[in-house]
Amino acid sequence: MKITVIGGGSSYTPELLEGIIGEQGLLGVSEIWLVDVPQGQEKLSIMEKLAGRMIRKAGLPIKLTATLDRRAAIKDASYVITQIRVGQLEMRRSDEYISLKHGVIGQETTGAGGFMKALRTIPVLLDICRDIEELAPDAWLLNFTNPAGLVTEAILKHSNVKVVGLCNNPINYYKKFSQTYNVDMEDISLTFVGINHLIWITELHVKGESRIEDILTGVSDSYEARNIPSFGWDLDFLQSLRAIPCGYHKYYYQTDRLLEQQLEQYRQNETRADQVRKVEKQLFDLYQDPSLDEKPQALEQRGGAYYSEAAVRLMTSLHADSRDIHTLNVRNDGAISCLPEDACIEVNCVVESHRVTPLQVGYVPPQIRGLLQVVKAYEELTVEAAVTGDKGVALQALTLHPLIPSAEKAKAVLEEMLEANRHYLPSFYQDIQGVNQ
């Protein structure tokens, strides 16, 4: 089995390698290819050395190759994993600072920041998909690249690649509740409804017994993501919502508090992008230590805990045709009746070797349906804008987003973001050649 990691120089790669090494008995991996772009060559070289040490420590006969040749890396792969950041951290910082300059939330996957990241990223992922169609037509593409739902929807609509989008949020809820109730993860059953970074948990069962009231009444806590401020939830709100919101809901349900905090960080030149840049530097300093031959615990500060476990569990299920349940980003196909058939949703799915099938969700109450439909409409328009380069569609997408207060604000943010990202937007600017970075 050949596994190709696009964005192999990512700071997350040791997490992924740890997972693959741990399940080698089930997967039988013969080759791992790490591929990146010239701008990431230094990090790729560091990662190649660390990966080699990890594989040698495990005593496994896995051939490791690091390259800038994406097509060679993709050829005949069984699984392609994408974890790229088009524009590097510099453009993430630009997204945050432009958003906050205009007084709106600046976040990597939500609002104006997620919108701009999607416009930069979708064309590159579709280009990767063309290579997969040609060179590894039977491969599964596991997409971790954010905004994962938007990127996966674009691939579902505009390529023939077998794709599944993944996020580490669902598995973190399983981990949290298994710890809370002191049971194995297999004893926890969760029903998720929504789209990537906008999922609600509508059912929580522990060994078959419903325990969702524990969370809604404050008896037990829910999972709190490391990269999102923790303000807690109002219990009256939770009980009337009748569902457990995910951490990213805070940008919608607690907008004022999060925006106030972000604006203070902006004034101090210390937004999340600045924080991540410092963490990444510390991580790569660690990775260069020739005695390091395992994933350092410091990686958990990066916000990607357990993402490798989600990826490796999915690969083993696909490989073994296990028909077990995973929470994934897939084509709707009627699973959520209030969303379009071709929308990308994040729900529980049955995984077989040849397909991934979403489970029917059933009735979605209006307090969930309202926000879900609006954000999904924004996502539909954003995918269209990314593919066509239509500025009018882009303006409508950004105006529709709940975190953008007016069409005037949307236009001002859009114009500045497009200009700042000109180099990465060949579909919007005909004088720009396509980029793979």
Question: Residue locations for each model-derived region?
Answer:
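A structured beta-alpha segment of the ubiquitous adenosine-cofactor-binding alpha/beta core
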Residues: 53-79, 85-86, 105-112, 123-136
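Glycine-rich phosphate-binding loop and adjoining beta1-alpha1-beta2 segment
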Residues: 23-59
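Short, well-ordered amphipathic alpha-helices
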Residues: 15-22, 46-55, 129, 174-178
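N-terminal Rossmann-like dinucleotide-binding module
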Residues: 3-35
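Rossmann-fold dinucleotide-binding core
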Residues: 14, 140, 144-208
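Long, compositionally biased stretches enriched for glycine and/or charged residues
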Residues: 182-437
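Rossmann-fold NAD(P)-binding glycine/threonine-rich loop
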Residues: 90-157
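Residues at the starts of beta-strands that form the adenosine-phosphate
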Residues: 2, 30-31, 63, 140, ...
